[in-house]
Design a protein with these regions (language model features):
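Phosphate/nucleotide-binding beta-alpha loop and adjacent structural elements of enzyme active sites
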Residues: 1-247
Length: 247
């Protein structure tokens, strides 16, 4: 599974994650709606914080099947599940990498339950709160640098789910944000105590770059919002692409 040492509870949790990745239909409705809104019907997607690959599975069920998905997951533990989840998809490239505000390395903090198993969905970089953690040194890279290295002139959608490090990614994504102009689907989380910014900074970054913001409500509709109120999953659309958009 990896070169790290895991206890029995963590090994059992790994197999449960793998089983969950095979059976879960989580995220399908929002993923299909996202791809339906994109101008491209064979989009290029960046999945930053891909976790065990549930969004990738959902994207590939769309009639607008992605041309290519770049999947980023820094955790060795989770990455090993991700690779197995997406192994049948020829349009997915996986990278064991944390996109960040600098190139180098950082510490990934994986909170532990009382049983010793890993709380996979809450792994994060930045300051930690009370409790026990499994820590791992992971490679970091600027999003703009990765895009340049891979010669990605077109990106249709960037999905970000990184437990509070959204703004750190955006610090390294100015060219992508202002020149390539993809749609962004971002889970904006409260970042108190982890970084010298907050969720409103992340939201404002998109508005300042001339994006419009939407969220997917309980009626399964995209609703426009002008200001950040509380943490949510937001779709940011370049304003120049709003005309004719069915949203």
């Amino acid at each position: 599974m990896s070169n790290l040492t895991y206890n029995f509870a963590q090994k059992i949790r790994w197999f449960r994650l793998l089983a969950h990745s095979r059976s879960s239909k989580l995220n399908e409705e929002v993923a299909l709606s996202l791809l339906d809104k994109l101008p491209s019907k064979s989009p290029v997607i960046f999945d930053i914080g891909a976790n065990i690959g549930l969004f990738i599975k959902a994207f590939n069920k769309s009639p607008h099947k992605p041309k290519l998905i770049f999947a980023f997951e820094p955790s060795t533990y989770v990455y090993s599940v991700l690779r197995l989840t997406v192994s049948r998809f020829k349009n997915v490239q996986c990278f064991k990498l944390a996109l960040d505000s600098k190139n180098g390395t950082t510490t990934l903090n994986m909170p532990l339950k009382k049983s010793g198993s890993i709380r996979v969905g809450l792994s994060h970089i930045g300051e930690v709160s009370k409790g026990d953690y499994l820590q791992e040194s992971v490679e970091t890279k600027l999003l703009d640098d990765f895009v340049e290295e891979m010669k990605c002139d077109v990106i249709d959608l960037i999905k970000i789910d990184v437990e509070g490090a959204e703004f750190e990614i955006l610090k390294g994504a100015n060219r992508t944000l202002t020149e390539i102009r993809p749609f962004w689907f971002v889970e904006i989380s409260e970042t108190k105590g982890r970084f010298n910014n907050n969720s409103k900074d992340t939201f404002k970054k998109f508005l300042d770059a001339n994006y419009a913001a939407f969220y997917f409500n309980e009626q399964r509709e995209w609703v426009a919002v002008q200001d950040y109120v509380n943490e949510n999953d937001f779709l940011f659309v370049p304003k120049e692409m709003l005309n004719g958009l069915n949203i």
